[in-house]
UniProtKB/Swiss-Prot annotation:
One of its GO terms (molecular function) is ATP binding. It comes from the Eukaryota. It is an enzyme of class 2 (transferase). It comes from Drosophila melanogaster (Fruit fly). This is Ubiquitin-conjugating enzyme E2-17 kDa. One of its GO terms (cellular component) is cytosol. GO terms for biological process: anaphase-promoting complex-dependent catabolic process; chromosome organization; compound eye morphogenesis; compound eye photoreceptor cell differentiation; female germ-line stem cell asymmetric division; germ-line stem cell population maintenance; male meiotic nuclear division; mitotic cell cycle.
Length: 147
């Protein structure tokens, strides 16, 4: 079941890739993918290229994939291990969701962080109290790690 679904998503991604994103298997292992997200324009991540790993569970799509950034990023919802705080990767997962939709959700999280549910409270505090400093630090990390 999982393999069939993963193959179908791979074909759909090839036919109709989401804007600013790409993803595909690492070598022959269809359960382990690498994804790329381009820093969205008009965000402090603009110009950066961010890499992520995707691990599909054997009972996919009934359980969510494990998605993590391998590129460091300054963001209140993404910690230094690359873990992402995004409801659809946890409690709000649904088998109707696809990797394409997950990547688009992560893109929109980059444009629009959720400081009220942070993985990194200190970054969330700066985001809420000093947006200019947040943008400056996010741009600096993007230049340092994603270019």
């Amino acid at each position: 079941m999982a393999l069939k679904r993963i193959n179908k998503e791979l074909q759909d991604l090839g036919r109709d890739p989401p804007a600013q994103c790409s993803a595909g298997p690492v070598g022959d292992d269809l359960f382990h993918w690498q994804a790329t997200i381009m820093g969205p324009p008009d965000s402090p991540y603009q110009g950066g290229v961010f890499f992520l790993t995707i691990h599909f569970p054997t009972d996919y799509p009934f359980k969510p994939p494990k998605v993590a950034f391998t590129t460091r990023i300054y963001h209140p919802n993404i910690n230094s291990n690359g873990s992402i705080c995004l409801d659809i990767l946890r409690s709000q997962w649904s088998p109707a969701l696809t990797i394409s939709k997950v990547l688009l959700s992560i893109c929109s999280l980059l444009c629009d962080p959720n400081p009220d549910d942070p993985l990194v409270p200190e970054i969330a505090r700066i985001y809420k109290t000093d947006r200019e400093k947040y943008n400056e630090l996010a741009r600096e990390w993007t230049r340092k790690y994603a270019m």
